[in-house]
Amino acid sequence: MAIKKYKPTSAGRRGMSTLDFAEITTDKPEKSLLAPLHKKGGRNNQGKMTVRHQGGGHKRQYRIIDFKRNKDGIPGRVATIEYDPNRSANIALINYVDGEKRYILAPKGLKVGMTIESGPEADIKVGNALPLKNIPVGTVIHNIELKPGKGGQLVRSAGAEAQLLGKEGDYVLVRLNSGETRYILATCRATIGQVGNLEHELVNIGKAGRSRWLGKRPTVRGSAMNPNDHPHGGGEGRAPIGRKSPMSPWGKPTLGYKTRKKNKASDKYIVRRRKK
């Protein structure tokens, strides 16, 4: 999809851009694959805020996505490419020959009318899902499982891709979008191709109100708060933070401080750590 830019007819329009949605073929989702989605506003079951900067936004319905891709040996035809408000990637509605309908993540190059398939015998072509042991070395993949049968957990956002680098026994070596190289069980599944909607990262939100439509609330600087609200707060005027390193609102070091648990069980599968 192309980026649509606007003339500066107002302060909010100046610099703003949107996607032109040329790839989207319908604005009416499949009703049988919709589920209600209740807003949490960043609160847990006790009503306490656990995630800041969330709340409000346009009402949404959840699209049930097939991340498992476990419908083996049954071909399906791409019926539509649709917008999904719950993720950065677009989704594709698949009509299988046995009558079932499922949504999948729409990879780059997938078009209406194309046929896709899942299973060990599927061809190596965009949109097909196979066990990692059946995918040739060097192939670009997405929607990668970490546990067989659990469904894809890695490489699912717009424009994301990973590459299969090699095979060693029961494991395959995969380079992820972050630069991390890690081993994944060879019986886990992945989908061929790169996730579509590559231009998503080029969109300029343009104004605060558009962020609010997306359910994003303002991010207030700690230095603009009082000292009882943030370690950076207080002082006369624009005072320095008064500490040797930046802190989170709860007094923990931040901005570069590593938060991954030491000696985590999955460390042995990571060959090369991700880039900063």
Swiss-Prot record:
GO molecular function: rRNA binding; structural constituent of ribosome; transferase activity
Keyword Ribosomal protein listed: yes
PROSITE patterns linked to this entry: RIBOSOMAL_L2
Keywords, comma-separated and alphabetical: Ribonucleoprotein, Ribosomal protein, RNA-binding, rRNA-binding
Protein's job: One of the primary rRNA binding proteins. Required for association of the 30S and 50S subunits to form the 70S ribosome, for tRNA binding and peptide bond formation. It has been suggested to have peptidyltransferase activity; this is somewhat controversial. Makes several contacts with the 16S rRNA in the 70S ribosome.
Assembly, per entry: Part of the 50S ribosomal subunit. Forms a bridge to the 30S subunit in the 70S ribosome.
Name of protein: Large ribosomal subunit protein uL2
Species the sequence originates in: Halalkalibacterium halodurans (strain ATCC BAA-125 / DSM 18197 / FERM 7344 / JCM 9153 / C-125)
